[in-house]
Structures are given as C-alpha cells and as structure tokens.
UniProtKB/Swiss-Prot annotation:
Region Disordered: start-end pairs: 48-198
Domain of life per record: Viruses
Composition skew (Low complexity), residue ranges: 172-182
Protein's name according to its UniProt entry: Uncharacterized gene 2 protein
Amino acid sequence: MTRGHRTALSPSPRATSLCTLMPCTAHTFAHAYCGACRGRGRLLPGQGSALRTATRPGQDSAPGRPARPRTDPGSPERRPAGTTCAGTGLERPPPRGARSVYSQSPARGSTAPTVVRAGPRVWERRRPRAPRRRGARGLPRGRRSRVALLGARGRAPHLPGAAEADRGELFAAAMAGAGRPRPAGEDPRADGGERTPR
C-alpha cells in the first residue's frame, strides 16, 4: 500500500485519535468510534496521539501528512506542545450555546470553578411537549372528544381524504370541544361556542 493512501482498511477521518471521554478499542477499526466524543475523535491537551490508530507501521493515519517518527505517543518529538491531533476538517463544532470540554467560558462575575459539561447530544434533545387538549373539557376523564380521535369530518386520520380536511376547521372544532364531527359545509364558528354533552 502507498504511504498516506486511504484504503478500506485505513482508519476513517474520525478515528485518527483516541476518544476524548472514553478511550476505547473502537477507534482502532475503520469507520468506528464509540460516540462519547460525539464523533469528533479529538484529544484533550494532556493526551498524546494514539499509535494504535494507524493501521500498520508504514502507513500514515491520513493522506497528505508527512511521515512521523515512531516514538512513544506522549513524546514532544511526535506531538508538538500545544497541539492535539491534526484536524481533518470533518470535526463538528460543539452545538451553539453548549458548554463542552473544548469551550469553557465561566459566567461573568462568578468565582466558582468551571464545571466541564458536554453539550446536549442531538438525539437526546427533548421533543416539544404537545399542547393540552382543551376539547375534552366536559367529557369524563380518559375520553377525548371525537374530533380529536376522528378528525374534523368524521374520518380517521389515517384514511384517504383526511388530509384534505381544512386545518382551520379542525383546529376550531377541537378548540370548541365539539362532541360530533361537523358536516362538510357547516361553518365551525356557527354555533359560537363550546358544545359539550351535559
């Protein structure tokens, strides 16, 4: 194999260093990382580059880099002071507004030591909470209005034709708490108020 030539056996750009939070053996394989570094595969300033990430002694871990002397990982000959692993251009910046391991900015005026927290992962973000259904106000608990279950014109929402229901009509009917589906031509605001069975 040519030196510096990326093949299927060489590590992916994300696997060019040990993981920041949990150094794991997944970084030694191609296109694999443990995920604790959120795919960036960066090093903390105290760590040295990983010897294991290059697949074999004659091959560089990324194309276009000069061949380095094979010294021990933490030595200054291999890793100059103040640098981490060489950037590949594919590292993602931390999410906006998040405190991560790499960007530590303490709050103004506080003397407390900085707490290092990783930013929120994309797949762990909370979904926005669904609005409360006000259509089931007068119904017994556990039973929603038929509008919420069937849609504004009496069709189940998964059946064909339900998508053509006017959204404004559906919203007004749900807000009014209608106990029955409205006919197609009826104005949803005709009765002027809430309809709940007594």
